């Protein structure tokens, strides 16, 4: 189970000492990540954390609107300085191949980058995640020194905890040794690979919950899981809970059906790897 600790908006869903904008101090007044971690681990399930904070840098764009608080100093510690896209720098959403080759600098300032690292370290120390998953935004080569510090911190902590952990990122953020993630099944490798990878796939036609969300059938999801495993990959299935945290019944039913299939066929899934052919 891999909840999002912080999405692009910059609001932490955990008890953070590095920002006042967190779920423990506002809104539900709960450490949502901590509570979920305890519940998941009580069931003997691995627990990971997803962090999208790097994309917060240019999530809030300047606007001509007059009735908003984007420029209010009271909220500067939440929004940060509004950013305009800079065509001369690698995008925070991920540089092009040409930008990587040219070694253009990251658009974020050093203060933001150090804060990003500190928040990652806070999440690592508080929740000891079995997997640390990152969305877009960290695959610029200019961020390699920072990412090296993060990986060293995480792996050294894991050695102290005496347990294996994994990093998962999109594109070639870490080049080798981590789990490459592909967003949606259509981007998955078509052949057996030498490296391990996974697909993050929504249970419906959207990642977040909306009224009338179109849900995939359990057979569709199982087919994608088996396809991926046969090619040395995995499937990270995104669930879309409502605003109150409840999982709609139609999603629950699909999960139960997948669970029933796994009870029968799990031996061919867990602890296995790709063979010489796939299909």
What is each stretch, according to the model?
Residues 1-279:
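Mature catalytic domains of secreted/periplasmic carbohydrate-active enzymes
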